[in-house]
Amino acid sequence: MTSPLITKAEVNSVFQGRSLLAEKDFTPAEINYLVDFGLHLKALKQQNIPHHYLEGKNIALLFAKTSTRTRAAFTTAAIDLGAHPEYLGANDIQLGIKESTEDTARVLGSMFDAIERRGFSQKEVEDLAKYSGVPVWNGLTDDWHPTQMIADFMTVKENFGYLKGLTLVYVGDGRNNMANSLIVTGSMLGVNVHIVAPDSLHPSKEVMDIANKFAEKSGAKPLATSNIEEGVKGANIIYSDVWVSMGESNWEERVKLLTPYRITMDMLKMTGNADNGKLIFMHCLPAFHDTETEYGKEIKEKYGLTEMEVTDAVFRSKYARQFEEAENRMHSIKAIMAATLGNLFIPAVPEDFK
């Protein structure tokens, strides 16, 4: 009796050929594996050990939004892995305007081995994956930011040595993609994620339902609250993001609503961990912590504020890990790219992790 045909990818890797569109597309164990793989690749980079897992591959980088960290991370990660990255910006490619997303996906899939997309619509990135026939990586949409999550939890694991049982508190706009991704990913990995925000800016019921479903298995305790003291108590990680994205019109309303939620040294003291080495601050950047930017000057002129989501004192303090976190974007993206495109031998991932 002949054996059924089994492809190399099926034997060798649980990741090969897969897209990362949202964190929930992968299992908690797979997300943790990517975190650990990112740490491994970071060590190889620091020791100048080559890791050309994507030699000869061509990768399309599609950007509808401006980007510093995501573009730089994907570009350097691809080059380190031996691949050729090709940047296509908003003026180069306009999905759904002159050509449908389906048609564009089919064309790009015939020329490139994988596609990264940083844009607005989650459906758009899902359609790219559906029709291109190659792995697609979500570099950010309005709903999710999965590549950021691997970097973030890499940073947490670097600082604490483990994930399960830690408490990460996100303070600010609880409806944005960062809050969505943090509470879902944390619940997958056994991290207690608290969203501390005004009631009108709490995560949607759909997002909380996803988080709670994962939390039932991991033991995490996700929470959304407007009470700052309750929300930050016991925090190991205080996390922030910008209050208003560039191009949005409701600055005044949002600034008034969120000013009480600015991260200060006093807020860090409320955690109870400010003096025992069990607290760090993280921010996905860019941050409005001073007036050294055009936007910072505009905010000061309009609202009289020299700081927004975080004070300059916290941003420059011993707790701050935002630049380490930013560097980890490259290593984590490298892990995602290599795992899903590199034909690596990963037949299974450990279900138990800490």
From Swiss-Prot:
Enzyme kind, highest EC tier: transferase
Catalytic activity: carbamoyl phosphate + L-ornithine = L-citrulline + phosphate + H(+)
GO molecular function per UniProt: amino acid binding; ornithine carbamoyltransferase activity
Secretion signal span: none
Main location: cytoplasm
GO biological process, one term: citrulline biosynthetic process
Location(s) in or outside the cell: Cytoplasm
Binding of carbamoyl phosphate, residues: S67, T68, R69, T70, Q94, R118, H145, P146, T147, Q148, C284, L285, R329
Record keywords, A-Z: Arginine metabolism, Cytoplasm, Transferase
Entry EC number(s): 2.1.3.3
GO CC terms, sorted: cytoplasm
Keyword hit for Cytoplasm: yes
UniProt cross-references to InterPro entries, sorted A to Z: Asp/Orn_carbamoyltranf_P-bd (IPR006132), Asp/Orn_carbamoylTrfase (IPR006130), Asp/Orn_carbamoylTrfase_sf (IPR036901), Asp_carbamoyltransf_Asp/Orn-bd (IPR006131), Orn/put_carbamltrans (IPR002292), OTCase_ArgI (IPR024904)
Keyword Cytoplasm found: yes
Family according to the record: Belongs to the aspartate/ornithine carbamoyltransferase superfamily. OTCase family.
NCBIfam families named among the record's database cross-references: orni_carb_tr
The protein's name: Ornithine carbamoyltransferase, catabolic
